[in-house]
A protein has these predicted regions:
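A short glycine-centered flexible hinge/capping loop motif at secondary-structure junctions
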Residues: 217-224, 430-434, 471
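Gram-negative outer-membrane assembly/targeting C-terminal domains
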Residues: 28, 463-485
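Amphipathic alpha-helical coiled-coil scaffold segments and their short linker/junction regions
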Residues: 46-47, 222, 226-227, 261-330, ...
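N-terminal cofactor/phosphate-binding cores enriched in small/glycine residues
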Residues: 35-87, 91, 98-101
Length: 485
């Protein structure tokens, strides 16, 4: 029976060693020099190499492309055409070139061109005829009411510009989420590593005692059942060690999604890169909470995102209000012929002025659009107010969680001190023969559980700190602007 248990224990230890060697080899393949891995290194990797964040940065290029496309409404347009009658009573050919430029200044448009007609003399009613040197023309059209202060083309440019600004808070929101997730991944890796260390220490205690009990059994001081009981304890602690190692490996793999090398490949952080201790954990400052409540609304990207959405709706509302007005357009057109006088009626400088008025009587399209936009603006305004309330709530809630986590650390440390005192007393009593193995095992397990609670309390504090920093958008200001893609 004892030999069978010893064989199982040996196999379990061999399996554990093989798993550790395999994982360590994979980690060594990817890891950087054996310096402790710090959170700042992980966050730097997220900022510069995390694929989802790099993909989010492309939104800047997308919105810049949309803005440039919208600005195409201000492109300088030119045209050229040739037409004629090669056969017929009048054999003529005409070359006509011109340009048109939308200025954007109160919706005005300038246009002009040059035309020349050659061939047989044309009758007076032919509008394409020119003198021998051709005709220069120039014109201007200005909308006085509708499409004056704003029109669909200028509204599209304004909204595309706002979309370009909107890319930054959208990216910043994702950056906050990625930083928080990467921080939690790092904290879980720290906690899993500390659990692994504790499991090894607990197993080492049982192994050392196993050797001592074996000597006592051989000397006839204790029964073999005591050795069997301790062997059972060794096996159970080896099982826990395997579980702790697997937990660490899972945490390292999860962290590797955020932590990458210069080739943008995931790095599996080896156990050797674990820091000796957890980061310093200070008590939350209630005065800082008051400051953070004020700053969070200003720094959180959701508020700016909603404000920009409101600005876009305001552009649409301005356009809808303008579309309620009638069309009242004025224009001027001037032309002058040059060269050989073939037509006596085309010698003079010509200037044409005109006014055009148009208006749909019901104006239902503009009225309906205006009603729709006013409703949407009210919706987004309510969303903005709720977003501010939610930000305040999140900051207070995460601060409360941070405060509770810090208090748990203090209580957990006291729990460890008391459990260690009891374990030490029970161990001394066992050495003197005043106690058997079972009470000592219970004291050791209680001390181990207390240490695990401390690890959990510390990791919970760091997770709560990550939540608080995300709620207050602290990492956005701390890390500065994102790099260009």
């Amino acid at each position: 029976m004892s030999h069978r248990h010893q064989l199982k224990a040996a196999l379990l230890v061999a399996l554990l060693a093989f798993m550790g060697m395999a994982f360590s080899s994979a980690a060594q393949t990817n890891a950087s020099p054996r310096q402790p891995l710090r959170l700042e290194e992980v966050l730097g990797s997220i900022t510069n190499q995390y694929p989802p964040l790099l993909a989010a940065l492309i939104e800047r290029d997308i919105t810049a492309g949309r803005l440039k496309s919208a600005q195409g409404t201000f492109d300088f347009n030119t045209f050229a055409r040739v037409f004629g009658m090669p056969a017929g009573y009048y054999e003529t050919a005409t070359v006509d070139t011109g340009f048109e430029q939308f200025l954007g200044l109160w919706g005005s448009t300038v246009f002009g061109g040059y035309r020349i007609t050659g061939g047989d003399l044309l009758p007076d009613y032919d509008k394409t005829r020119t003198q021998g040197g051709g005709e220069l023309r120039f014109g201007l059209k200005v909308p006085l009411l509708r499409d004056g202060s704003i029109d669909r083309r200028r509204a599209a440019v304004l909204k595309a510009g706002l979309d370009k600004e909107l890319a930054d808070p959208v990216i910043a929101r994702q950056q906050l989420d990625f930083i928080r997730a990467g921080t939690v991944g790092y904290v879980n890796w720290l906690g899993a590593g500390e659990r692994w260390r504790l499991a090894e220490r607990l197993l080492s205690i049982a192994n050392d005692r196993h050797n001592a009990i074996s000597n006592q059994v051989q000397a006839g001081l204790v029964g073999r059942i005591v050795l069997t009981d301790n062997l059972r304890l060794v096996v159970s602690r080896e099982i826990f060690l395997v579980q702790a190692q697997r937990r660490f490996e899972a945490a390292a793999l999860a962290l590797s999604l955020f932590y990458r090398n210069t080739s943008d490949e995931p790095v599996i952080a080896a156990r050797e890169r674990l820091p000796d201790t957890f980061p310093m954990m200070t008590a939350p400052d209630g005065i800082q909470l008051d400051r953070d409540l004020q700053l969070a609304v200003a720094k959180r990207p959701e508020v700016r995102q909603i404000r920009l959405a409101l600005d876009k709706l305001e552009v649409d509302r301005r356009l809808a209000q303008n579309q309620m007005l009638p069309n009242l357009d004025v224009g001027a057109f001037a032309s002058q012929n040059f060269g050989k006088d073939r037509y006596p009626d085309l010698n003079e400088f010509e200037l044409q002025l005109g006014v055009e008025f148009r208006m749909p009587l019901q104006r239902r399209e503009a009225r309906g659009r205006l009603t729709e936009l006013e409703g949407q603006i009210q919706q987004v305004t309510n969303q903005e107010r709720f977003a501010r309330n939610r930000i305040h709530t999140e900051v207070r809630d995460t601060f409360s969680a941070l405060l509770a986590a810090h208090q748990q650390i203090q209580q957990a440390q006291l729990n460890v001190e008391l459990a260690e005192e009891l374990r030490s007393a029970e161990e001394e009593k066992f050495r003197r023969g005043g106690s058997d193995l079972l009470p000592l095992q219970l004291r050791e397990q209680a001390a181990f559980d207390a240490q695990l609670l401390t690890v959990e309390a510390r990791t919970e504090y760091l997770r709560a700190l990550a939540d608080y920093r995300a709620a207050t958008a602290t990492d956005l200001a701390a890390r500065g602007p994102l790099p260009a893609r």
